[in-house]
């Protein structure tokens, strides 16, 4: 039998157009249509953690004597391709375009509304 090696996970950082603190809307999956704030981005895995979306329940065993176990609910990550930036003013989700200003700075702009993010 040949010896097989497990697949190597790419460690290359992926540029993400979604940043911490952005308001996003989920476009696919069981939480489709939900909106929330991005709590954390995971650029190596190309995933984001969104507040109130993809809730998972975890059972924690007691760590010390006399302490009781507990059930913890927390947000799990969602792939970045499954969320879109959300405009709170127009109440619509949109794709993002990178715009270079005259002074050379890069800004993010919502394609549907033309609203500047940064």
Swiss-Prot record:
Source domain of life: Bacteria
Classification via InterPro entries: KOW, Rib_uL2_dom2, Ribosomal_uL24, Ribosomal_uL24_CS, Ribosomal_uL24_KOW, Translation_prot_SH3-like_sf
GO cellular component: ribonucleoprotein complex; ribosome
Gene3D superfamilies referenced in this protein's UniProt entry, alphabetically: 2.30.30.30
Entries under SMART domains matching the protein: KOW
Record Pfam families: KOW, ribosomal_L24
GO BP terms, alphabetized: translation
Record keyword Ribonucleoprotein present: yes
Alphabetic keyword roster: Ribonucleoprotein, Ribosomal protein, RNA-binding, rRNA-binding
Signal peptide limits: none
GO molecular function, one term: rRNA binding
Functional summary from the UniProt entry: One of two assembly initiator proteins, it binds directly to the 5'-end of the 23S rRNA, where it nucleates assembly of the 50S subunit.
Family: Belongs to the universal ribosomal protein uL24 family.
Quaternary organization: Part of the 50S ribosomal subunit.
Protein name from the UniProt record: Large ribosomal subunit protein uL24
């Amino acid at each position: 039998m040949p010896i097989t090696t497990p697949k190597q996970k790419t460690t290359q950082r992926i540029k993400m157009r979604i940043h911490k603190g952005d308001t996003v809307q989920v476009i696919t999956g069981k939480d489709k249509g939900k909106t929330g704030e991005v709590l954390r981005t995971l650029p190596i895995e190309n995933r984001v953690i969104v507040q109130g979306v993809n809730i998972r329940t975890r059972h924690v065993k007691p760590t010390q004597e006399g302490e009781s176990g507990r059930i913890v609910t927390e947000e799990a990550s969602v792939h970045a391709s499954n969320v879109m930036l959300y405009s709170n003013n127009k109440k619509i989700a949109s794709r993002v375009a990178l715009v270079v200003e005259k002074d050379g700075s890069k800004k993010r702009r919502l394609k549907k509304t033309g609203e500047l993010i940064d």
